[in-house]
Amino acid sequence: MAALKLLSSGLRLCASARNSRGALHKGCACYFSVSTRHHTKFYTDPVEAVKDIPNGATLLVGGFGLCGIPENLIGALLKTGVKDLTAVSNNAGVDNFGLGLLLRSKQIKRMISSYVGENAEFERQFLSGELEVELTPQGTLAERIRAGGAGVPAFYTSTGYGTLVQEGGSPIKYNKDGSVAIASKPREVREFRGQHFILEEAITGDFALVKAWKADRAGNVIFRKSARNFNLPMCKAAGTTVVEVEEIVDIGSFAPEDIHIPKIYVHRLIKGEKYEKRIERLSLRKEGEGKAKSGKPGEDVRERIIKRAALEFEDGMYANLGIGIPLLASNFISPNMTVHLQSENGVLGLGPYPLKDEADADLINAGKETVTVLPGASFFSSDESFAMIRGGHVNLTMLGAMQVSKYGDLANWMIPGKMVKGMGGAMDLVSSSKTKVVVTMEHSAKGNAHKIMEKCTLPLTGKQCVNRIITEKGVFDVDKKNGLTLIELWEGLTVDDIRKSTGCDFAVSPNLMPMQQIST
């Protein structure tokens, strides 16, 4: 109240000092602060910045793969020895770097993540019952964090409807004998405009450990390229946010409109002592080679699928491509066609792999591969990325599958008790009815087991979400009510051949044609 009175009196003084023409006299005084004191506290020792994190704390840890991870702060936690942590992070780095170091030292009790990925120790601890893992769709994870920072306690999303995320029962912790000790709980379901949505609760942390590029001495922060990812929403969602940066600059060095995170969200700040900035998957192209090759010599089956998948692209479309065959299909996009490739880690306008001297640890795709961007590209955070995806702004999603059902159910993220990679962003990518979903895969699994079947036997990624299936044997269109229709058939095969290798019935288009291949 005293401050308001002071401001009020200052404004009255300013007003009374005006002459009849509205000009200010020299004696005018407006009591606005010009102090350089800021609430962000600066540290030189990362251990000092995190030493009060208690056992059992919930930590939000930024990064995507190894891109944009707070290396120095993670190293400091190894030194403090804090334990029984709940770590909220898209994934857990690799076995010997990033959060993988805290897993190895058994300091983490529970991970809330979207992707286990290639971290063998992460998967081993989970399947052996040593670690609790709450697997959450990547876009839902980003939005839960964003909501937590915005004071929104919960929200509805179509992502995960009809899957274990909605139904409950997904393993969070295993017993030593492989049985489920803790399972996820069902989500509340509501219907809006004829579509089903599930209720997801916001996530907040006791502390957030964030990696940024630069900060000014006021505590304002900017990120670099695709290293923004989960770092940005996590800044806003913790009781105490600790940010490590590569450089600290003077106040005024940033134009106000260029600041990514205002100082109000930054409580502690430290300049990292050193950075390894390890690259998880160094992918390069050679000089004069504009595009990567489509596959290894002799991979005729994959080549066939890739060259058919490339025909799904249309000029001007926005597309998100999964790793493997979908991404390789982009190598065959015509130079006369523009397709804007979106990557869920926060890039729009992906280009080819870099030359050796262009590789940048801060610029990767969703497969953690080094990439470049094309003119007109943009970078953004993970929550922004999935707003594009969930909102139906991406025209095409192309991804692989373990199983697809007759009516378009998709399974591609888990084999219970055996393989847990996590759903990553796949559940979000297939959640919008405005986005065409194309599955590319080999027609049969090992031992000629069916992959196209009456009903999926593996946990679903999405329910009735697939629009088209492309295999080396043919192309199916999928109708949510009427099922499959064979529209293209590989030369030399018969419809009976397809029936024998397909685990459900299907219709045959009256306009059945030979399987198309893009010309090269």
Curated annotation (Swiss-Prot):
It is found in: Mitochondrion. Keywords: Lipid metabolism, Mitochondrion, Phosphoprotein, Transferase, Transit peptide. Pathway: Ketone metabolism; succinyl-CoA degradation; acetoacetyl-CoA from succinyl-CoA: step 1/1. It catalyses: a 3-oxo acid + succinyl-CoA = a 3-oxoacyl-CoA + succinate; acetoacetate + succinyl-CoA = acetoacetyl-CoA + succinate. Pfam families: CoA_trans. The modification N6-succinyllysine is found at K185, K418, K421, K455. SUPFAM superfamilies: NagB/RpiA/CoA transferase-like. The active site is at E344. Disulfide bonds: none annotated. Residues 1-39 form a transit peptide. It comes from the Eukaryota. It is an enzyme of class 2 (transferase). The modification Phosphoserine is found at S170. Its EC number is 2.8.3.5. The keyword Iron-sulfur does not apply. One of its GO terms (cellular component) is mitochondrion. GO terms for molecular function: identical protein binding; protein homodimerization activity; succinyl-CoA:3-oxo-acid CoA-transferase activity. Homodimer. Only one subunit is competent to transfer the CoA moiety to the acceptor carboxylate (3-oxo acid). This is Succinyl-CoA:3-ketoacid coenzyme A transferase 1, mitochondrial. The lineage of its organism: Eukaryota, Metazoa, Chordata, Craniata, Vertebrata.
